[in-house]
Amino acid sequence: MRLENKTSNMLWFITIVLTVLALSQLIGYWVNSTISENTTIEWSSLIHFTHIRNHGGVFGMLQGMGWIFAVISIGLLIGVSAYLWFSPAIKRYEYISFGFIVGGGASNILDRFVYGSVIDFIDIQHVPYWNYIFNTADVMVHVGIWPLLFFSFFASNDQIDSGIPN
């Protein structure tokens, strides 16, 4: 890949990371400032805002061990960034997808450092066997993961090469 393309793609990556990080932090700050902890506000019959603190990891596992997830996440974010810079054949959609993943992950790490826990608040109702509360950073991680999974399973390299610019 030419250096100009690499630089352009890294700019996409950095822009998305910073945008996701800023938006997620602003929304988390708003939740923390306006909704008391362990309080629910019904936005609609499907979506409630329930302010909780996650001191553990994904789905609240390993409560009180959030620092382990912060350390692991920092290592992963550094690894992904290095992978994007040093790997010779990465497509633009990968830079964009990883931008959402890294931005969301960085936001959750920043929550742990600023608040001592992750601020979760999106509470989906009326879904059987679903009782998890999550945040915008988690949503952004999924926004990044799903295109990576889709293209890796359902698109051939020829389709990706012909339809998506480097």
Protein language model regions, located:
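Alpha-helical transmembrane bundles and membrane-interface segments of multipass inner-membrane proteins
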Residues: 1-166
